[in-house]
């Protein structure tokens, strides 16, 4: 009796999991409002709305590769969903990552489908968001040369 119920629950949870299409790094970069090398300083669970939690990360933007209106400053708080099934990111305090996302009302947001995955990563590098130490050495310079169409087009 428990096996069919457990199987049904697993099937439902898998069907509601976050699914992302793989896209080239430049396409993800150009579709993002902001991209930075970010060091995580804090992680706090916050209530977004009735019954829904989110995670708020304190970040230090070590290097900014893309920002709205080419600003040299980005807010030091980044928001994401608390669960991977809702496309949320899990980030470790003290680690540095290549992060990219959207900016809505001066608030930074990230999700698993909007992360840049450089071509040529070592096979053992897995995961949705890439730790900075695993980014190919030439990729930061490559990002600086990306030419993106205007967001208005």
What are these regions (language model features)?
Residues 2-153:
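Transition segments tied to proteolytic processing and entry into folded domains
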């Amino acid at each position: 009796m428990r096996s069919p119920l457990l199987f049904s629950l697993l099937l439902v949870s898998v069907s509601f999991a976050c699914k992302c299409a793989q896209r080239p790094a430049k396409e993800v970069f150009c579709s993002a409002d902001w991209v930075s090398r970010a060091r995580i300083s804090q992680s706090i669970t916050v209530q977004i709305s009735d019954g829904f939690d989110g995670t708020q990360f304190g970040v230090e933007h070590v290097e900014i590769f893309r920002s709205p209106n080419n600003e040299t400053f980005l807010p030091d708080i980044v928001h994401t969903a608390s669960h991977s099934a809702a496309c949320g990111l899990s980030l470790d305090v003290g680690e540095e990552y290549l992060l990219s996302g959207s900016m809505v009302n001066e608030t930074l947001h990230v999700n698993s489908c909007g992360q840049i995955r450089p071509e040529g990563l070592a096979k053992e590098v897995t995961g949705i968001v890439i730790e900075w130490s695993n980014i190919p050495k030439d990729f930061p310079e490559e990002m600086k040369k990306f030419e993106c169409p205007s967001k208005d087009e």
